[in-house]
Amino acid sequence: MLSKQSIANLTEADLAGKRVFVRVDFNVPLDNGSITDDTRIRAALPTIKDLLSKGAKVILGSHFGRPKGKVVDSMRLTPVGDRLGELLGQPVVKCDDCIGAEVTAKIASLPNGGVALLENLRFHAGEEGNDAEFAKALAANADLYVNDAFGTAHRAHASTEGVTHFLSPNVAGYLIEKELQFLQGAIEAPKRPLVAIVGGSKVSSKIGVIETLLDKCDKLIIGGGMIFTFYKAQGLNTGKSLVEEDKLDLAKSLMAKAKEKGVEFLLPTDVVVADNFAPDANAQTVGVDAIPDGWMGLDIGPDSVKTFQDALAGCGTVIWNGPMGVFEFDKFAVGTEAIACSLAELTASGTVTIIGGGDSVAAVEKVGVAEKMSHISTGGGASLELLEGKVLPGIAALDDR
């Protein structure tokens, strides 16, 4: 397992009076300037509060949206600073930039146990370009570095990788530590049987994770739009369902690899089909060998839900990445919601349940069972890349234990 130094290894003596640059992920959804979901801000609180309690001067840096290296007023972090102040119960000093003399002056006047929030890092092109001069300017206002932004750990940016060349120590925050513990633990030393559920619309976006999981898991459940590429590869009629014609050979090879490795490979046996892609489309449930021409599959059927629930019974660990159907449409959310509820029940009986980022997180939140899972990953692409066994630059840059 990637054994990295963590904030937990730092004492009050290490931190009191020190300027700590903390890379956080405050890329929260906004509606007319109001935050609609503050989950990402709350996820960073354990790290921020720990540093404050040890007398550090905390300097927070985050990206927000995609301003592409220019100042975009609607992407300023002011609403985030206001919400963070409410959650911490103390004022947050808001900077109008993330580098420069004004920022340096504001940080210099911070008391021990004070917090400053830098302006959107991506207002500077040097952030995503991992420009050494920009990274050096960020680091100039700090003594040590904490990365707690798992969602951007798969990117080598100035604030995730570049700054580590100018600061020491460089450690993981509690959020990243938890992500590594669960996601890597599930791949490297899982409580067995290990069952992986992979959904979503395209096989192409999940090839790496499926191939890695076939080497690790005992059962692999496939759902979502990608199932139709597997059906077409088996010679079945898929109607108007989404099929990646250039991935048919790959689908065949993945099924063959599962057989060769003794991994139980489960595809749905029935699907809910619709006459068009709309929330109010006409729908019917059919066997996968009876999909009518002109209809498209938008969810797994009730028999498949039952089969998948039986396959999950008694498992030690479940990793779930990607919905079972078009869960944004209530009519086609039944399969995804049933799996979410099953995982909540399994967690209560001792199964380790890991929701691996992206749409599956939105699904468990929609059903209201997010709190009942063992771990919900805060990364989309980062979660997938970690599960694929890839090196994440933002993690690799941290100090080894």
UniProtKB/Swiss-Prot annotation:
Subcellular location: Cytoplasm
One Gene Ontology biological process: glycolytic process
GO molecular function: ADP binding; ATP binding; phosphoglycerate kinase activity
The enzyme's E.C. designation: 2.7.2.3
Residue stretches spanning the membrane: none
Amino-acid positions noted as binding ATP in the UniProt annotation, renumbered to this chain: 206, 297, 328, 357-360
Annotated catalysed reactions: (2R)-3-phosphoglycerate + ATP = (2R)-3-phospho-glyceroyl phosphate + ADP
GO cellular component annotations of the record: cytosol
SUPFAM superfamilies named in the record: Phosphoglycerate kinase (SSF53748)
Cysteines engaged in disulfide bonds, as pairs: none
PROSITE patterns, sorted: PGLYCERATE_KINASE
Pathway: Carbohydrate degradation; glycolysis; pyruvate from D-glyceraldehyde 3-phosphate: step 2/5
Major location (coarse): cytoplasm
EC class name: transferase
Subunit description: Monomer.
Family to which the UniProt record says this protein belongs: Belongs to the phosphoglycerate kinase family.
The protein's name in its UniProt record: Phosphoglycerate kinase
